[in-house]
Amino acid sequence: MSYTEKPDEITKDEWMEKLNNLHVQRADMNRLIMNYLVTEGFKEAAEKFRMESGIEPSVDLETLDERIKIREMILKGQIQEAIALINSLHPELLDTNRYLYFHLQQQHLIELIRQRETEAALEFAQTQLAEQGEESRECLTEMERTLALLAFDNPEDSPFGDLLNMMQRQKVWSEVNQAVLDYENRESTPKLAKLLKLLLWAQNELDQKKVKYPKMTDLSKGVIEEPK
C-alpha cells in the first residue's frame, strides 16, 4: 500500500517557543550593534554604546570623522563639497569608480532642480553628464529621468518625485560609504545586514520548496505570521 506522508509542519506558537528557548549571548548581540554603528559611521552613538555595553569597537572611532563629514554634506545636498572632500581623502576613488562619480553628479543635478535653477541644471547636464550618458545606457536612462523633473511645475509631485525625497540622498550616501570602506579595505556591509539577507534567502528557499513555516513578513518590526 502506498500513501503520501504528510510533511512536518510547525505552528507559530511552536516556532516562538523555540526562539524563546534559544540562548544568544548578550555580548554577541552587542558586538552586532557596535559593528552596525561603526560601519554606518554613527560615531556618537558608538561612543555612547561603548560606555553602556563595555564593547570596544573594531576601529578607532576618530577615523569615522571624515566619513561623518561626507555624510552630513550629502544629506544636506552639498554634493560638490562632498566630492571635494572625497577627492582630498582618496584622490583615485572617483576616477576608478565611474558609476559612483556619476551618481554624485546626478545628485548635484537633482539639487539644482530642487532649487529651481533650471538654466544651471541644463548647463550642468550638458557639460558634466552628457558624455557619461553617451557611454552608458544605464547612465543615460538615469539622466533622462532626472531631467524629466524639469517638465513639471511641481516636480515633487511628478512621477519622478522620488528623486527629490530624502531617501535619494540617503541612497547616494550609502553608495559612497560602501565605496570608501571598500577602498580602505574595511568591512563595508554591517554583519546585521548580512544576517537579514541570509534570513530572506532562507525564507525564499523554503517558499520555493512549498514548505509551510512561520514567516517573518516585516523585518523592521519582527512580525511573524502563521504558516500558510
Curated annotation (Swiss-Prot):
Keyword Transmembrane recorded: no
Pfam hit, one: CTLH
Keyword vocabulary terms for this entry: Cytoplasm, Nucleus, Ubl conjugation, Wnt signaling pathway
Matches recorded under SMART domains: CRA, CTLH, LisH
Residue span, CTLH domain: 63-120
Key word Cell inner membrane present: no
LisH domain ranges (all copies): 25-57
Region of interest: Interaction with CTNNB1: 116-212
Residues in coiled coil: none
Cleavable signal peptide: none
GO annotation (BP), single: Wnt signaling pathway
Record's comment on post-translational modification: Polyubiquitinated through 'Lys-48'-polyubiquitin chains, leading to proteasomal degradation in the absence of Wnt stimulation.
GO cellular component entries: cell junction; cytoplasm; cytosol; nucleoplasm; nucleus; ubiquitin ligase complex
Locations listed in the record: Cytoplasm; Nucleus
GO molecular-function terms, A-Z: protein homodimerization activity
Function statement: Core component of the CTLH E3 ubiquitin-protein ligase complex that selectively accepts ubiquitin from UBE2H and mediates ubiquitination and subsequent proteasomal degradation of the transcription factor HBP1. Acts as a positive regulator of Wnt signaling pathway by promoting beta-catenin (CTNNB1) nuclear accumulation.
Subunit details: Homodimer; may also form higher oligomers. Identified in the CTLH complex that contains GID4, RANBP9 and/or RANBP10, MKLN1, MAEA, RMND5A (or alternatively its paralog RMND5B), GID8, ARMC8, WDR26 and YPEL5. Within this complex, MAEA, RMND5A (or alternatively its paralog RMND5B), GID8, WDR26, and RANBP9 and/or RANBP10 form the catalytic core, while GID4, MKLN1, ARMC8 and YPEL5 have ancillary roles. Interacts with RANBP9. Part of a complex consisting of RANBP9, MKLN1 and GID8. Interacts with CTNNB1, AXIN1 and GSK3B.
Family: Belongs to the GID8 family.
Designated name of the protein: Glucose-induced degradation protein 8 homolog
Gene designation: GID8
